Each structure stands twice: as C-alpha cells, then as structure tokens.
C-alpha cells in the first residue's frame, strides 16, 4: 500500500511456540514497551495486528499505549479481531484507534472451474488422477471416527493414505491451525495432496486459505457435499490437483469474512466499531521460510486487513504531514463505501444477506478518495479526555492517559457531541440532538446533505448547507432526530448522512437503538 515506506518491527509476543501454534499471547508490559520504543523512534503510523481485551479504556495497557501514540501524532491501526460472526466481539475499541474488519478481494484462484484458495508450494502440482480417501476411511485402528474425519494427529493410518489425496473436514470453526495441522498430518501420512472441506455453519460458499504442508484444495460446505456425494457413488473415487489460474474482477466483492469480529462495541455502544473494513481474505503475505517452507504464503484475518489500512494512513501522512491522527482517521472513514463492485450493499459472509455497519463500520476503504476527503471530523487529545470523563474515571487513573496534571474533567459532557466520524445513538427516547464539527481540508465549496434515516426515525439537519470559503475553516452542524418511540424497533437500526459538494463525498453511518421499553 505504501511501497516506499520504511518499516520498523517491534516484538510484543514472546510466548508463541511455532510451528505448534500454542499461543499464550502478549504481556501488556511488552506491548506498552514496544509502543514507547516506536514513539521514541518517531514513527508516523503504527500497525497493531493483535486483538486487545475488551476491558475498560483505563484498565488496559494497549489503550494507554495507543493513547500515548495519539498524543505524539501517531495513529494506531488495529485489527478488530477474528472472533466473528457473533455480535459484540470487536476488539481494539478505543476511539483514538482505527479498528479494521476483514473482507474479500475481487481475485480468486480456480482450477477447471472449481474455485479454491491455496498456498502454491514450490513443488510441481501433480496433474494425474490419484485415489481419494476420506479421513474417516483412513482411520487407524482404535482412533475416534470424529478425530479421523478432521485428520487430527494420531488418527490416520499411513498405510491407507500413502500416494492418495486425503479428504479432511473442518471442525466447524475458523481457526488457521486446524487447516494447517491437517495438512501436516496428510504430508506425514504420505498423501500427495489434501482436500479440506468447511462446515455449513461457517457460511456456505466461504473458504479461507492458510499455509498447507501439501498441495491443497479448500472447499466450501456446498462444494464439499458434492465431493462427498461423488466419493460415496463409486468404489474407486479419484481426483487431481491442477495448477491455479488467477481471476480478477470477481463479483460481488467485497464480501465480509465470517471470522471478522462484529460490533456493537462492548466498551461503549455509543462508538461504532469496527471503523472500516479492508482486504483480509486470501492475502499473499510474507512468511518466515523456516516455518512455512516458503517466503510467501496466503493468509487470512483482520491481521491482514490492518496493514492495508496502515499503508493508506502512511500515504495520507506523506501527502498531508500536518494532519492530526483524527483527521487521517476521518479521511479513511468518511470516504469508505458500504457498496460492493456491483453497486449493491456489501454482503455478509453467507452471501445472501446484507452486512451491517457492525461488520464493516463506515465501509470498505477507498485509498484514492481518502487522499482528498474534502472535509474531516478533527479532534485532539483533550476531546478524547473529555470522552473518557463521561464515565467518569478516577482522576488518578486519568493521569495515566493525559500526563497533564492541570487537566480537569468538564462539569458535563454529552457523548452525542463527541466529534466522531460515525454517529451512534443508544438508549434513544424519541428525541436527540447530535452536534458535529467539520473542517475544510480542500478548496472552498458548498456542501449539501443527503440523509437516509434509520427506519421509523426522522432527521433534520441545521444548517441546511455548509459553505466553506477557505481552507481549515470549521463549521458546526446539528442533527435533530425524532421518532414515535412506541412504534420504533428496539433492535439496532441503521442509516447514513452524506455531505457532498459534487466532487467530495463525506459519509457517516448512523446507528440508533431505542431505549428498552
């Protein structure tokens, strides 16, 4: 994303034992030390491809470290986590951090019309037909049938698998090590290849790519059922694994990754998280060759999406070196799109229903548009401190964030006036006023609003137009929301606000949840 950027790496996780994938995680003190080193080194952007605990802002070392980075003009881009699609799983929910979900790209690898996603190893792909055998049929005497179906270690009979293609099932969860370790079992059993089939509850038509120790085809549940029907229809099932072809411009895309963590924000549902989504499925990434037997492999996760956005932030910082972290974040969020390349709403991982802002935040990132957003929602550290004061914290704890002994919480602070690029209203009682400030970072222009209100909610905006006569001019506007609360859904409902001058599009999602009756 930022081809001439200088990269500096800081180690935070000292407890990963590769290649067994037994991960304990990072200690907060190591995370904080890495951030302080980055701050001292004068980096411009921090990529944090690691999920934090959903603890209170003031009780979390990552929250404190990222706040200190923001104070020093460094924006942190962090992964929303891979605990989706369940609601309320989004991590790194700090308002001064740009959190990122993961979605697909418009590229697939296919072979003879069968779509699959695969790490292409250095060895030649065998083109002839080989016998197929399922993990269950390859079970070693005394092993559990379920374990053998999943191709778990110690469950497969080498004498039954050597020279064949082993068919393994997924455990019904999206965990990279399941797929990888199954391929290791296949390799150690002498298989010439593996077919890995995902379970239905992950999302039909959805597959991932991970590191494979043998040549591998990964199938969705639907395609897997077709394969198993074929296997059961003949006494001698055979298959071949052919080389891949690269297809671009696939529609529809993006589609949300089912693993991508979702909102609402468990720390504070008044702040929408994740903030945006970016390419995070089947990404060609650099890998340590001593572990993955190659310098490159296909990877999936919000840890892959996060660097894409960090690169965008670095490019914005290069073009606009005087912008605050909030301005850079706003530019990325307000230019993101909730539509796919068919012009339709981004679909969820099941491919049949529309995703919501709890999956994609403000939308899928648009790098070129983010360089010239027109307007930004700007903030500084005191805006974030005022936000924290709304809870309220103990003053001694607050000093860990501010290090400003003269700072005192305001007498009152309305979170609806927090100048965030997205708008969330919880415990809505039928009337609410939201205040925002927009700063002109482009040429003079007149912006007019376009509102798509959440169902059952009426929204008025004041003033009706925003006329900017010069750069850096700031204009305050208000949204006035009204609804018949007795007839309003108590579920989360969604809308949007767009300010446009015919060239720039400054979009904010609107999320409303009525107070429980």
Task: Label every model-predicted segment.
Residues 1-517:
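Loop-rich non-cytosolic ectodomains and luminal regions
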